[in-house]
Swiss-Prot record:
Lineage top rank: taxon: Bacteria
GO molecular function list: DNA binding
Organism: Actinobacillus succinogenes (strain ATCC 55618 / DSM 22257 / CCUG 43843 / 130Z)
InterPro entries per UniProt: Ig-like_dom, SfsA, SfsA_C, SfsA_N
UniProt xrefs under NCBIfam families: sfsA (TIGR00230)
Membership in a protein family: Belongs to the SfsA family.
Name of the protein in its database record: Sugar fermentation stimulation protein homolog
Pfam families documented for this protein: SfsA (PF03749), SfsA_N (PF17746)
Length: 238
């Protein structure tokens, strides 16, 4: 997935959920939009280098958007979780997700379920059961272990219930944890943050819901991040 043209700044603070102040190389303070509504644990430390894009829009109040954080250890994190579906869509098209490579048709954002949800991707293929794929972003990493969620997620809990219902109807149901952070080599559910999500997902997995975690890797040109892609499955620690 190609990233927009990025420019560096130093993170100062995040506030009102959707806004952040950063310091430009010339010392100017710029307010940028933050698309991530989560806790962003470990991704928003004062003094971190951030990378932002400029939409050049004349109608947006904050035309610049926070895209990545470069951590003190050198790891990169895509904090713009709106990009996760684009990342996974590209991986599905390129058959990177081996468990789903047999499907030929990809339908994004399809309404389904009894709780008025939208599935990130509905996959179809000749002679195959319909496959419902829910995408979750891995931005939280500790000791090289990727984790989800970074805050209690009632929405995520609802998605697990909906996926289990699809499985019981004879379809495939998959939670795909996508690496937006390049600093992990295995994955686990952050049960210490959301024990209910952990309980629901593990129960659903015992009943046939599938869960996979894929690592992400960034490409750079002259030290500027230019692309992000999913590279391969990592171990899922239960």
């Amino acid at each position: 997935m190609q990233l927009p043209l990025l420019q560096p700044a130093i993170f100062i603070r995040r506030y009102k959920r959707f806004m952040a102040d950063v310091e430009l190389p010339n010392g100017e303070i710029l307010t940028i939009h933050c698309a991530n509504t989560g806790a962003m644990t470990g991704c928003a430390e004062k003094g971190d280098t951030v990378w932002y894009s400029d939409s050049k829009s004349t109608t947006r109040k904050y035309p610049c958007s926070w895209e990545l954080t470069q951590l003190s250890n050198g790891s990169l994190v895509c904090i713009n979780t709106h990009r996760s579906n684009q990342l996974v869509h590209e991986a599905l098209q390129n058959k990177v997700i081996k468990e789903l490579a047999d499907y030929s048709e990809i339908y994004p954002e399809v309404k389904y379920g009894e709780e008025n949800s939208r599935i990130d991707f509905l996959l179809k293929g000749e002679g195959l059961p319909d496959c419902y794929v829910e995408v979750k972003s891995i931005t939280l990493v500790k000791n090289s272990i990727g984790m989800f969620p970074d805050a209690v997620t009632t929405r995520g809990q609802k998605h697990v219930r909906e996926l289990l219902a699809m499985k019981k109807q004879g379809h495939r149901a998959v939670v795909l944890f996508a690496g937006l952070h390049n600093g992990f080599d295995c994955f686990k559910i952050a049960e210490h943050i959301d024990p209910e999500y952990d309980r629901l997902l593990k129960d659903a997995m015992r009943q046939g819901v599938e869960a996979y975690a894929y690592a992400g890797a960034f490409e750079k040109t002259q030290e500027i991040p230019t692309a992000l892609s999913l590279t391969g499955k990592v171990p899922f620690i239960e």
